Amino acid sequence: MNRRRRIYEGKAKILYEGPEPGTLVQFFKDDATAFNAKKHEVIDGKGVLNNRISEHIFTQLNRIGIPTHFIRRLNMREQLIKEVEIIPLEVVVRNVAAGSLAKRLGLEEGTILPRSIIEFYYKADALDDPMVTEEHITAFGWASPQEIDDIMALAIRVNDFLTGLFLGIGIQLVDFKMECGRLWEGDMMRIVVADEISPDSARLWDITTNDKLDKDRFRRDMGGLVEAYQEVARRLGIMNENDTPRPSGPTLVK
């Protein structure tokens, strides 16, 4: 499609003006970042895989009645989405101890949590996205108490769905991050799932081997990120079985 006016550029995506009022085009970049972009490389093919995987997940969420901003995929790197007012919070749902939770609480990575835990982080790169409580959220007006309830209800439903989806293809959903936005339809407003859900924003471990199939491969310098994302896509049925990773591995552009 013809390139339109750029609205916003983040670490992994660019938002462009959409073809119709109330729509945007979301472009998936090949940039891989970690630790709030303190670590950064460009990995050829990552954006294409995230676009396809996120499309698959959001299509399924829409199908089972979980509202999202997703309309349809336009091409290999772009999606048509509904324009929403993003709530400045990262919502993290944790099922297994890993990453910052394991470090913060002294838990062994891989420990199954007593129940799923929902955490909120304020979206501010300059502050390293600090963890915040519901008190912070309401005091600073980032979301109302009712909106927090709606966000938590969505998070629980998405977690239930994703846990089952990935379990069915031999993958354990360790944790994931999602974002929400306010979708205005006339005088009515509702909270919907926005941004993306992909191996960039979820920890995915092979159930049998515990191999990491997510962005931890980049965070921890393990290599094989594109191959891991391809494996997730293959198991989800959105890549042909005979598609194989390039023997030379992903191309890194410094």
UniProtKB/Swiss-Prot annotation:
Record GO biological process: 'de novo' IMP biosynthetic process; cobalamin biosynthetic process
Enzyme class: ligase
Domain of life: Bacteria
Key words of the record: ATP-binding, Ligase, Nucleotide-binding, Purine biosynthesis
Any one GO CC term of the record: cytosol
EC number(s) from the headed UniProt entry: 6.3.2.6
Family (UniProt): Belongs to the SAICAR synthetase family.
This protein's name: Phosphoribosylaminoimidazole-succinocarboxamide synthase
Originating species: Brucella canis (strain ATCC 23365 / NCTC 10854 / RM-666)
Organism phylogeny: Bacteria, Pseudomonadati, Pseudomonadota, Alphaproteobacteria, Hyphomicrobiales
Gene (name only): purC
